[in-house]
């Protein structure tokens, strides 16, 4: 990328909204009583993704698991198709491999920059062309429509590590990775998720349009298009197009996202808040284009970078900053360095380089 373009993108940092916590005078006593997850957040329009420390699981045995056999069978078949796709990769044309990488990155951004940082957390704002791109990319990813994805994710933050958390990591690696999609939702997930304020997404026509036409959209964008393009445009075999460009690519995107829910809640350091389960996991960040700095993200869910370090192993932040340089993204929320360091000192596990 040309140096002047990098300079333009870097200078666009000055347009971010810096979030600080400046208690002084009589306010100091008030701040002591404010839950840590609320102290630094100044977003008046979004509170549904902030952890609720008052919520506790009800005592008693958990409900019996109800398996969703349709999901189990489809998930097994998909992963078998993905494994077969790995075997076929050496026989693929170079264009097919490059197209698969492009489709992976685009659909991943539909989750990370779209469903996650834009629509779940409102960490930045996007103009219509960017929102259209992200809604298409999100449909390519096929991980439920934006509305449902954001509702589950807000519940995950607000009721993290409880039965109201859709992919509660306290129930083990397999459950938080994929098992939660193979069983009926816990009653607490339905109850608490149904009470979340989703009015911001209900008011967004593009999100509701995607929700209304999601099934035909996902069939076209996730399965039909990535199969037909290599087959028709450069003469790839239909089998390679189907199993590599479609099944393998889709399987990889799914598992990269799921690792944020599983591995990044079980393995890694907790430099920002040792009292929560989410961890910093560099390997997860590599696959999930920047989503592995999870202890930071759960500590500061309102930071558009989902990380203290902006572009470091964080392609999603680089993408958002490029969009800002083009005038398509704006009002990016960024936690101040002073606030981050203060939080590290208060609740970190001592693993941060500043400790």
Swiss-Prot record:
Cytoplasmic face of the membrane: 1-68, 115-213, 260-355
Pfam families: FA_desaturase (PF00487)
GO cellular component: endoplasmic reticulum membrane
Region (Disordered): 9-33
Short motif Histidine box-2, span: 153-157
Keywords annotated in UniProt: Disease variant, Endoplasmic reticulum, Fatty acid biosynthesis, Fatty acid metabolism, Iron, Lipid biosynthesis, Lipid metabolism, Membrane, Metal-binding, Microsome, Oxidoreductase, Transmembrane, Transmembrane helix
Single GO molecular function: metal ion binding
Membrane topology value: Multi-pass membrane protein
Domain remarks: The histidine box domains are involved in binding the catalytic metal ions.
Role played: Stearoyl-CoA desaturase that utilizes O(2) and electrons from reduced cytochrome b5 to introduce the first double bond into saturated fatty acyl-CoA substrates. Catalyzes the insertion of a cis double bond at the Delta-9 position into fatty acyl-CoA substrates including palmitoyl-CoA and stearoyl-CoA. Gives rise to a mixture of 16:1 and 18:1 unsaturated fatty acids. Plays an important role in lipid biosynthesis. Plays an important role in regulating the expression of genes that are involved in lipogenesis and in regulating mitochondrial fatty acid oxidation.
Similarity comment: Belongs to the fatty acid desaturase type 1 family.
Protein name in UniProt: Acyl-CoA desaturase 1
């Amino acid at each position: 990328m040309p140096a002047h373009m990098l300079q333009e993108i870097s200078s666009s940092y000055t347009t971010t909204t810096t979030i600080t916590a400046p208690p002084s005078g009589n306010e100091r006593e008030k701040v002591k009583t404010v839950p840590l997850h609320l102290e630094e957040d100044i977003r008046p329009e979004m509170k549904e993704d902030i952890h609720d420390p008052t919520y506790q699981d009800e005592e008693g045995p958990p409900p019996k698991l109800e398996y969703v056999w349709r999901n189990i069978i489809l998930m097994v078949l998909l992963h078998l198709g993905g494994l077969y796709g790995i075997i076929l990769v050496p026989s693929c044309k170079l264009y097919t491999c490059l197209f698969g990488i492009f489709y992976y990155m685009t659909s991943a951004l539909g989750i990370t920059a779209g469903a996650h940082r834009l629509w779940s957390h409102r960490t930045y704002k996007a103009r219509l062309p960017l929102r259209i791109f992200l809604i298409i990319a999100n449909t390519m990813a096929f991980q439920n429509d934006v509305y449902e994805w954001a509702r589950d994710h807000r519940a995950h933050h607000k009721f993290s590590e409880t039965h109201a958390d859709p992919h509660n990591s306290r129930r083990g690696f397999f459950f938080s990775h994929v098992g939660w999609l193979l069983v009926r939702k816990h009653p607490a997930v339905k109850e608490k998720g149904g009470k979340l304020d989703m009015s911001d997404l209900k008011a967004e026509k593009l999100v509701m349009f995607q929700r209304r036409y999601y099934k035909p959209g996902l069939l076209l964008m996730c399965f039909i298009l990535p199969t037909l393009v290599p087959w028709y445009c450069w003469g790839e075999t239909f089998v390679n197009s189907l199993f590599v460009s479609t099944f393998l690519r889709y399987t990889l995107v799914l598992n990269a996202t799921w690792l944020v829910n599983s591995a990044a809640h079980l393995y890694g350091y907790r430099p920002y808040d040792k009292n929560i389960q989410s961890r910093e996991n560099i390997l997860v960040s590599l696959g999930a284009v920047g989503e592995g700095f999870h202890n930071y993200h759960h500590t500061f869910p309102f930071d558009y970078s989902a990380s203290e370090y902006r572009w470091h192993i964080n392609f999603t932040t680089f993408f958002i900053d490029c969009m800002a340089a083009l005038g398509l993204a704006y009002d990016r929320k960024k936690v101040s360095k002073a606030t981050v360091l203060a939080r590290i000192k208060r609740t970190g596990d001592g693993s941060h380089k500043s400790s």
